[in-house]
């Protein structure tokens, strides 16, 4: 048997951009049975949340997954609004994140599900998502207080250009 302590992941950085505020995790009071669903954007997060919801709620149809399993690090609504709503939940919590593990507070008692998807496939879904997003999404991300960094604009029409920019900025 090993005498070495487990080296749990540690948060070593914060991520603030037009979508994310990783500091929301700093103030979360974890419960022992919390489930954290982590993926890069457009990699099956909502699908995984729906599967977990079906397991936790015995197949109950029409669950409001976005409400009962919030994206904790999304800037909108701000963490001052979101954290009390999460704390008030009485069901087993399952929370969404798009943060890399080094920007996420890790709780050894929580359960983690990570989904990966080939980046060459992801970039097509992201481009499609933003190319077809309505003005309300862009207004919420760009005009809500707390924006860090540049405003987000619509993607270029040329998917190859978008892919190269996505690679250049390491997907963020």
Outline where the language-model segments fall.
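PAPS-dependent sulfotransferase catalytic domain
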Residues: 1-172
